[in-house]
Regions:
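N-terminal, polar/charged subdomain of small-to-medium soluble alpha/beta proteins
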Residues: 1-90, 98-109, 113-134
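Phosphate/diphosphate ligand-binding glycine-rich loop within oxidoreductases
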Residues: 94
Length: 134
């Protein structure tokens, strides 16, 4: 299985995961999830994310490897953004390729769910001119 895991402070490119996962017909399915910075209350002016370099990538790689074994993936792409972002900015990309669509859907959801609960990211929101840790 080919794997790409990264944490970056630059803007995410929407087509990059699917371009990277293309495998000349080996996979019958590719599923891509893009998460955006959201502001449900109409108050968040910015979001700032920090992480522990090295540890974060290791946790993400472990999650991807676990998904790859469970669903026999051909490829997986996980990129998470850190730094300061605005509502609507892409913050995370998770994409997988597999022989069949059900495996791709399930693995993509699994990776995203574990990423939200296990990856060591710390965030604060800028509201009304002040930063607040979330």
């Amino acid at each position: 299985m080919k794997i790409h895991v990264a944490v970056t402070d630059t803007a995410l490119v929407p087509a990059q995961p699917s371009d990277w996962l293309r495998d000349a017909g080996l996979s019958g399915a590719m599923v891509q999830f893009s998460g955006q910075v959201r502001d449900e209350q109409g108050r968040v002016e910015a979001l700032h994310l920090e992480h522990y370099p090295g540890m974060t990538e290791s946790v993400l790689s472990t999650i991807v490897e676990q998904a790859g074994k469970q669903w026999h993936l051909n490829g997986a792409w996980v990129v998470h953004r850190v730094g300061t972002m605005s509502p609507g900015d892409d913050i995370v990309q998770v994409a997988v390729s597999a022989a069949h669509r059900q495996a791709a859907f399930e693995a993509c959801a699994f990776i995203m769910d574990l990423l939200k609960t296990r990856a060591p990211f710390w965030k604060k929101e800028f509201i009304g001119g002040h930063w607040f840790w979330v």
